[in-house]
C-alpha cells in the first residue's frame, strides 16, 4: 500500500524537493490497464504544485518528494494514496491503482 517508485532515469541525486517548494514536473497518468487519463506532456506545459499543500493526490506528492532534480520515475499509487473508493467519476474508477510517469524538471 502507498506509493512505489521505480527510477526510469536518475536525477542529480542531491537536490530533493523541500516542504513549501514548488515542483515543476512533466507527467503522464495511467490506469493499471495502460489507459492514459491525463498528461502534461500532451499539453506541452509542465505542471506545478507546492510540496506539503495537498494540491495533488497523496501518492503523487509522496513520490515526487523522494525524487531528485532531473529524475524520471514511474510512481505506482495504490487507491489509499490516490482517489480511493470514490474514484474520480468519468475518469478514475473506484479503488483504482494509478501509474504516473513523472519527470522532476525544476524546483522553485
From Swiss-Prot:
Its main location: cytoplasm. It catalyses: [protein]-peptidylproline (omega=180) = [protein]-peptidylproline (omega=0). Belongs to the FKBP-type PPIase family. FKBP1 subfamily. It is found in: Cytoplasm; Sarcoplasmic reticulum. GO terms for cellular component: calcium channel complex; cytoplasm; membrane; sarcoplasmic reticulum; sarcoplasmic reticulum membrane; Z disc. GO terms for molecular function: calcium channel inhibitor activity; calcium channel regulator activity; cyclic nucleotide binding; FK506 binding; peptidyl-prolyl cis-trans isomerase activity; signaling receptor binding; transmembrane transporter binding. The keyword Isomerase applies. SUPFAM superfamilies: FKBP-like. Disulfide bonds: none annotated. This is Peptidyl-prolyl cis-trans isomerase FKBP1B. Has the potential to contribute to the immunosuppressive and toxic effects of FK506 and rapamycin. PPIases accelerate the folding of proteins. It catalyzes the cis-trans isomerization of proline imidic peptide bonds in oligopeptides. Identified in a complex composed of RYR2, FKBP1B, PKA catalytic subunit, PRKAR2A, AKAP6, and the protein phosphatases PP2A and PP1. Interacts directly with RYR2. Inhibited by both FK506 and rapamycin. It comes from the Eukaryota. Residues 20-108 form the PPIase FKBP-type domain. Detected in heart muscle (at protein level). Ubiquitous. Keywords: Cytoplasm, Isomerase, Rotamase, Sarcoplasmic reticulum. Its EC number is 5.2.1.8.
